[in-house]
Amino acid sequence: MFHILNKGSSKSCIYTRPCLKRFYHQHYEHTGKLSRTFFSPTHIKYNRLSTLDTSTSTANAAPDPQVLTFLSKRMQAAPLYPKPSAFLELGKPRLTVLVVLSTMSSYALAPYPGLSFNTLAWLTMGTALCSISANAFNQSMEPMLDCQMARTRSRPIPRGAIRPEYAWLFATLTGIAGTSMSFLVNPTVGWLGLGNIVLYMGIYTPLKRISIVNTWVGSLVGAIPPLMGWAACSGGDLLSHPGGLITAAMLFAWQFPHFNAFSTMVKDDYKKCGYQMMAWKNPALNARVSLRYALAFLPLSYAYISTGLVGPWYAVPATGTNMFLIARAWKFYRNRNYQNARSLFFASLLHLPLLFTLTLACHMIKVWNDSDSKNPVLGSEEDTLKY
């Protein structure tokens, strides 16, 4: 139990004043030693959740009864009219923005004439709502597990900001709206959007407590948005040009160094809740897979050159950017400690946006250079100029 030791008093009390922005919070650990840790006001507000003893949970054990009781009370106390911010949190806005950016990047990279603002608008809104729906479904299915992990216990449902039935309704409505908008682009985009929601909610989420294969399934979820962007630009054709599949393969490969590093940082929480992750089930495999897929970026980047999407000069910045990620994946492979995992995680956050920015820049340079002659990728000279 976390306590504040009052000056001049041998008694301790729970500190409840929300006016202080930051303060020293003293508590006894299980070892009996006194330590000091900075806690933010958000942590103070939900510190009762952190005091619940969930250390005895295992992969096959039921949630602690104390956790069930506390969560039940929180859900019952949830407001009848939740704040809009609670719905926003259900959709994980930062993750949704990244998903939309990957879709738009693929749309911009596709070498097809007649790019349409209306198509891009429907694609953007449809992708965003599909992502919001999948994230909301995920949180609706796992409140019991979310309240046991430090990084997720302040989500809307565990902290009592929104009722579970409202979360389910929100996920359903955004899913219907998102897939409807995606179908307005073309049927291929619509089916990809719907399939991604089903894959995330129906397969990936329950598989997390069954097998480490969940990481590969989750990577498929991340690879679908670029296919949606490519299909939107190509009229639903994903096979006549390999660029869309290459972009999707990049997003698939990126998930492994990114997520494997992150799961290493929070592996104790995952183990406590029974999530079957390589980080604690097989740490050596976890590091090998991270390095393997980091190395995959080299041939995937060069594949862009062979398809004519970018010029040969693209190899220089692409190689440098990929080596930035590979170097940290190699360090993590050699020494699987927290520091190297953290370094790889933040490197992955920089790597993908930088690589896509370079790819789009080199693609546009090639388009401009080829604008006065017929381009075999774009088709006729007239289409090239229109593009």
UniProtKB/Swiss-Prot annotation:
Tell me where it resides: Mitochondrion membrane
Reaction catalysed by this chain? heme b + (2E,6E)-farnesyl diphosphate + H2O = Fe(II)-heme o + diphosphate
Per the UniProt entry, the Enzyme Commission number(s) are 2.5.1.141
Membrane topology (UniProt): Multi-pass membrane protein
Q: Which GO terms describe its biological process?
A: heme A biosynthetic process
User: Which GO CC terms are listed, alphabetically?
Assistant: mitochondrial inner membrane; mitochondrion
Question: Which residues are connected by disulfide bridges in this protein?
Answer: none
Question: Keyword Membrane: yes or no?
Answer: yes
Give a yes or no for keyword Iron in this entry: no
Gene3D superfamilies xrefs: UbiA prenyltransferase (1.10.357.140)
| MF annotations from Gene Ontology | protoheme IX farnesyltransferase activity
Q: Pfam family example for this protein?
A: UbiA
- What UniProt keywords are attached to this protein's entry? Heme biosynthesis, Membrane, Mitochondrion, Transferase, Transit peptide, Transmembrane, Transmembrane helix
Q: Which segments cross the bilayer?
A: 95-115, 117-137, 183-203, 212-232, 242-262, 284-306, 311-330, 345-365
The protein's predominant localisation is mitochondrion
In terms of NCBIfam families, this protein maps to:
cyoE_ctaB (TIGR01473)
The protein's job, in short, is: Converts protoheme IX and farnesyl diphosphate to heme O.
**Which HAMAP family has this protein been placed in?**
CyoE_CtaB
What family is this?
Answer: Belongs to the UbiA prenyltransferase family.
Q: What protein name applies here?
A: Protoheme IX farnesyltransferase, mitochondrial
* Natural source organism: Schizosaccharomyces pombe (strain 972 / ATCC 24843)
Taxonomic classification: Eukaryota, Fungi, Dikarya, Ascomycota, Taphrinomycotina
